Amino acid sequence: MEEVIKVSNLTRKYKDFSLGPVDLSFPKGFATALIGANGAGKTTLMDIICGITAKTDGTVTYFGETDNADKGNVKERIGYCASQAMFPANWKVRDIALSMSLAFDKFSKDRFYSLLGELGVTDEKNSKKPLSSMSDGMKMRVFLASAFARDTDLLVLDEPGSSLDPLMRDRLCDRFRDYIDSGNGERSIIFSTHNIADMENAADYVIFMDNGKVIEQGFTEDLKDKYIALSAEPESLDKISPLLLCSSHSSSTATGLALAENKLKLEALGAVTERPTLSQLSIDLMKIAEEKRDRKSVV
């Protein structure tokens, strides 16, 4: 697998949180989703990749060539979109267009305004508002337009769908696909989310994080083949529980996650199995990680 970014033995230590050590390869030519609960370390990892936050140890290799995010050619090739304030609060759309055109050689004002139109920020009322007067969703549309208006090889987007309505998230997924397809295998996206439900179709590769660690990763279809979601009668839980990675139950049904290699055994014990969605996988993998932490804290 050819990678666009390679992370080796990466750590970042704070007083109350530690990222890593993380070893990852982000595949070139695909959209990779970083999935995890709030505080899992997604933003820290992305900020290190973009040179915004310093790492404590380890290396990040960009485009198979360099480990320096501050090099001019690397900065020109990476577009970044934060989930929080990217520009001064009193700036308007025209200020952002001017700033981006001065900062980056391959920023297109025409493209920027065209994207704003696609994302519904074209009317005079919105375009003349300062960022401080815009809703979170409207600000995110402006931030995304500023990132997509650059001619880059990699987009790094922190929680791009979190403040968007379902229609805009759907349009964003289309924009992801257009960006990837236009690169003929040379363009990649890394985006983070704590809720993949509305953006599942945008993720070719997924990395699940919990408490600063990577707990699972792989191409989306491969992971869906690796695991199975299941449901069963509650009275069957004792029989099938040894084969389950996690489970939950109510008075009427029991559900859980298992490895696909145990599919026939589980069905023979009365369970109904199906291919999991990424949303199901993310919830269950986070449950498994939480249960492991709880067991360690007891010990």
What are the residue ranges of the model-derived segments?
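Catalytic Walker B motif of ABC-type/P-loop ATPase nucleotide-binding domains
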Residues: L155-E159
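C-terminal coupling/interaction segments
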Residues: C173, L244-C246, S250-V299
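Conserved beta-strand
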Residues: V7-L10, F17-P27, G58
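Helix-to-loop junction immediately C-terminal to a conserved catalytic motif
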Residues: C50
